[in-house]
């Protein structure tokens, strides 16, 4: 079978973002957004989803992290959608509970063709490293809308914001790995015939 790959660039007055992904990879990655903690979370996602990710973002971090984080989510979602192609033979659904020390999170998703996000997580800190915690939801929203997946993210319990965020990204990787996995049916997993 042919690897599912995509290469996209997005240039605005606020950011310049490039991504190259392989959904059938092994989790290789080289990621530079200028926001160290975001890089780390995307590396974890890449590893746990078995998706090769090469991503660079040159954004207006002198203003704040909003544009960079959102635009990375946008291009990531677009690349995922493009790489999936016609969606024949995928499992479609993925759900994963991910423990990270005292934190337990739930990620559930549907590669449905309908972009939607439910995000139920509270943070006590304004930032973890240089990443604004309010931007975690914005990243997942941008990814969900642009990849056209339905995505539910919930932290069930826990205190440490770093652990919460890491649990979400790892769980997202594992759920997406299951959903994008190919099966032997080689048909679109919908009674409608399309997703």
Swiss-Prot record:
Pfam short name (any one): IGPD
Keyword Secreted belongs to the record: no
Primary location recorded for the protein, binned into one broad class: cytoplasm
MF annotations from Gene Ontology: imidazoleglycerol-phosphate dehydratase activity
Catalytic activity: D-erythro-1-(imidazol-4-yl)glycerol 3-phosphate = 3-(imidazol-4-yl)-2-oxopropyl phosphate + H2O
Enzyme class at the top of the EC tree: lyase
Its EC number(s): 4.2.1.19
A GO cellular component entry from the record: cytoplasm
Alphabetical GO biological process terms: L-histidine biosynthetic process
Keyword rRNA processing listed: no
CDD domains listed in its UniProt record: IGPD
UniProt keyword terms in alphabetical order: Amino-acid biosynthesis, Cytoplasm, Histidine biosynthesis, Lyase
Subcellular location as annotated: Cytoplasm
Pathway(s): Amino-acid biosynthesis; L-histidine biosynthesis; L-histidine from 5-phospho-alpha-D-ribose 1-diphosphate: step 6/9
PROSITE patterns for this protein: IGP_DEHYDRATASE_2
HAMAP family linked: HisB
Family of the protein in this entry: Belongs to the imidazoleglycerol-phosphate dehydratase family.
Protein name: Imidazoleglycerol-phosphate dehydratase
């Amino acid at each position: 079978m042919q690897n599912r790959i995509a290469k996209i660039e997005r240039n605005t007055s606020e950011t310049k973002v490039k991504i190259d992904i392989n959904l059938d990879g092994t989790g290789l990655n080289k990621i530079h957004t200028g926001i160290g903690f975001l890089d780390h979370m995307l590396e974890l996602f890449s590893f746990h989803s078995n998706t090769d990710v090469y991503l660079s973002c040159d954004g207006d971090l002198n203003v704040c992290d909003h544009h960079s984080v959102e635009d990375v989510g946008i291009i990531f979602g677009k690349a995922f959608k493009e790489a999936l192609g016609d969606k024949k033979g995928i499992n479609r659904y993925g759900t994963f509970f991910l423990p990270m020390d005292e934190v337990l999170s739930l990620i559930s998703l549907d590669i449905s063709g309908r972009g939607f996000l439910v995000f139920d997580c509270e943070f006590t800190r304004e930032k973890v490293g240089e990443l604004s915690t309010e931007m975690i939801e914005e990243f997942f929203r941008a990814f969900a809308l642009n990849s056209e997946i339905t995505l539910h993210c919930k932290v069930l319990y826990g205190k440490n914001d770093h652990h919460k965020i890491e649990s979400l990204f790892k769980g997202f990787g594992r759920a997406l790995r299951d959903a994008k996995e190919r099966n032997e049916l080689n048909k679109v997993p919908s009674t409608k015939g399309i997703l």
